[in-house]
Each structure stands twice: as C-alpha cells, then as structure tokens.
From Swiss-Prot:
Its EC number is 1.10.3.9. The gene is psbA. It is found in: Plastid, Chloroplast thylakoid membrane. Gene3D superfamilies: Photosystem II protein D1-like (1.20.85.10). It comes from Dumortiera hirsuta. This is Photosystem II protein D1.
C-alpha cells in the first residue's frame, strides 16, 4: 500500500511538471522545446560572455600563431571576438574532456565550438517553441516558418560552411570585425557578390526594409483619431477597440494615387503575407547560397569575357572585382599559405620523357 501511494505521488509530480511545461497561462511560455532551449541558450550566452572578456589567444590557423580575441587581451568591443576553433582540430568534436588540459582547450579555440553548437540547438528549439505555442493556441504555424530564415542563415555560416570547408576554423568569428573578416574572405574565395542567391538575399533584406517602412508609415498616417469622452466612439478610434485601428481604404487610395492603382494592396491578408514572404524567401536563398558555396559551387566568373577583334581583353567590372578578390585572397591567413589557392589549384603541366 505504501509503495502504491509513493508511485501515485511521483506520478502526480511528473504530471504537474508536464502541465506546467505545456501550459499557455505561464507569463513566459516554456513548452517541451523550451526544456532544451533554455539550458542550451544559457550555456551559449554564459560561455560567450566569459570568453569575450577573458579567453586567451587562439591558434586559429593551426600554425602556432595565436590570434587574440578577448577584452583582457587587448581588444575593444569592435575588434573583439570569439576566435573560431583551430584548424588543427578541423571538424572533430572537441569538448573540454577531449583536451589534455583546459589551457590546451582554450588555446585550440574550444569555446567557439561549444558556443556555436549550443547556440544552434537553442535557436532551433526556439523555432520549435514558436510552433508549439502556436499549436496549443490554435494558431497557424507561419511564425515559426518565418523564423526559419534567420535560423537557416545562422546554420549556414556556423555549421554548413565549416563542414564544406573541412574545419570549424573557417566558421564566422563571433564578433564585429571578425564578421567583416569572414565576409571579405568569403568574397575572395567564393565571389559571393556574383552569386544570384546572394543577390536575392540583398533584394529580400533591402526590399523588406523598404516595405516595412512603407507599411508602418502608411498605417500610422491613416490611423482613425482617438475620441474624447465628450464625443461618440463612432467619431473615431477608441483605445482598446477590437476593430482595425486604421483605414485601409484610405491607405489604399493614397498609395494607389502615389504610384498607380495596382501597386497598392486592398486586401489586408495579401498585404501581410507579402510583407512576411519577401524577406523570408530572400534570406532562405542567401542561406542556400552560403550552403552551396560551402562546397565551392561559387558565384559567376565573367573574368576576361570581353575581348576586341585582336583578342585583347577589355576589362569589365567583373575583372575589377576579380582583381580585388585576388588581393584579398593573398592577404588573408598570410602565413598559412606559400601561394594563393588559385595558383595551388592549377594542375602541374605534364612532363614527357
């Protein structure tokens, strides 16, 4: 009888825990995805803060030339970063217990791998948590679908690209100037500016900013005015009313006259679908572009594609970009290569004899 009561008590504790996790009444929703999201994001954030402040220099290129990234080792907020895991580690799973000492783990950039893997798990669970809360509230799932765009982008630069290049040392550093360095080297090695998927991403981000500003300003400019207690609520907008707070007909009429009639949405659902889909699809394409360039399927190469009748090259902007790419390529990781990768990739001429 005692054992039976204990089982019931333990079951009720588990049941209460399940009810608490899945409840939609909590001030902050937990959800089953949150059970994994909370510890992974807390771990990633804590290690990031500690490493950004105090981590020793990291041998990123695996050539015994450590690069400093933390504040206590001479950096500021702009130049500081979590330095990627050493090329000597490659793609190996490198937790603390795999190193001979904590000093070795820090020297080889172990914190980067720890932060990135916990962060990616955490943001994926955040996306799952968005879906879970939507599901429990009877909503449609498109919030999580929209969030999949930045999740895909982060996964591309922190995981897919290192996998394609063979080392976590090629991942994006976790800092401001480190991000710029990653972008410059990526352009040098993959010609990303000439990749159509990157162009779609630029259109998505800039277009999304434009459409967001247009929508917000139009709605704000066509708000129905708030009424006072001395006039009828029918005369304008009353705080807290359930109906739409702006006049979409007025906004449609204004914008239709500003551009032309069919450039303006008169359907609120179509408008908001467009506002969500434009940047999301653009960022999806950019993430896909990074993931294909990870395996060296690079941007278009139009180098020396225009020649005169004598066969002499007439430079185009593609040739100017190519010259810049070569300059950036020979300058990065300057002590890790004896010659640029473009020269190294050429097969040696056959020798007959």
């Amino acid at each position: 009888m005692t054992a039976t009561l204990e089982r019931r008590e333990s079951a009720s504790i588990w049941g209460r825990f399940c009810n608490w996790v899945t409840s939609t009444e909590n001030r902050l929703n937990i959800g089953w995805f949150g059970v994994l999201m909370i510890p992974t994001l807390l771990t990633a954030t804590s290690v990031f803060i500690i490493a950004f402040i105090a981590a020793p220099p990291v041998d990123i290129d695996g050539i015994r030339e450590p690069v400093s990234g933390s504040l206590l080792y001479g950096n500021n907020i702009i130049s500081g970063a979590i330095i990627p895991t050493s090329a000597a580690i490659g793609l190996h799973f490198y937790p603390i217990w795999e190193a001979a000492s904590v000093d070795e783990w820090l020297y080889n950039g172990g914190p980067y791998e720890l932060i990135v893997l916990h962060f990616l798990l955490g943001v994926a669970c955040y996306m799952g948590r968005e879906w879970e809360l939507s599901y429990r509230l009877g909503m449609r799932p498109w919030i999580a679908v929209a969030y999949s765009a930045p999740v895909a982008a982060a996964t591309a630069v922190f995981l897919i690209y290192p996998i394609g290049q063979g080392s976590f040392s090629d991942g994006m550093p976790l800092g401001i100037s480190g991000t710029f360095n990653f972008m410059i080297v990526f352009q040098a090695e993959h010609n990303i500016l000439m990749h159509p998927f990157h162009m779609l991403g630029v259109a998505g981000v800039f277009g999304g900013s434009l459409f967001s500003a247009m929508h917000g300003s139009l709605v704000t400019s066509s708000l129905i005015r708030e009424t006072t207690e001395n006039e009828s609520a029918n005369a304008g907008y009353k705080f807290g009313q359930e109906q739409e707070t702006y006049n979409i007909v007025a906004a449609h009429g204004y914008f239709g006259r500003l551009i032309f009639q069919y450039a303006s949405f008169n359907n609120s659902r179509s408008l908001h679908f467009f506002l969500a889909a434009w940047p999301v699809v653009g960022i999806w394409f950019t993430a896909l572009g990074i993931s294909t360039m990870a395996f060296n399927l690079n941007g278009f190469n139009f180098n020396q594609s225009v020649v005169d009748s004598q066969g002499r090259v007439i430079n185009t902007w593609a040739d100017i970009i190519n010259r810049a790419n070569l300059g950036m390529e020979v300058m990065h990781e300057r002590n890790a290569h004896n010659f640029p990768l473009d020269l190294a990739a050429v097969e040696a001429p056959a020798v007959n004899g």
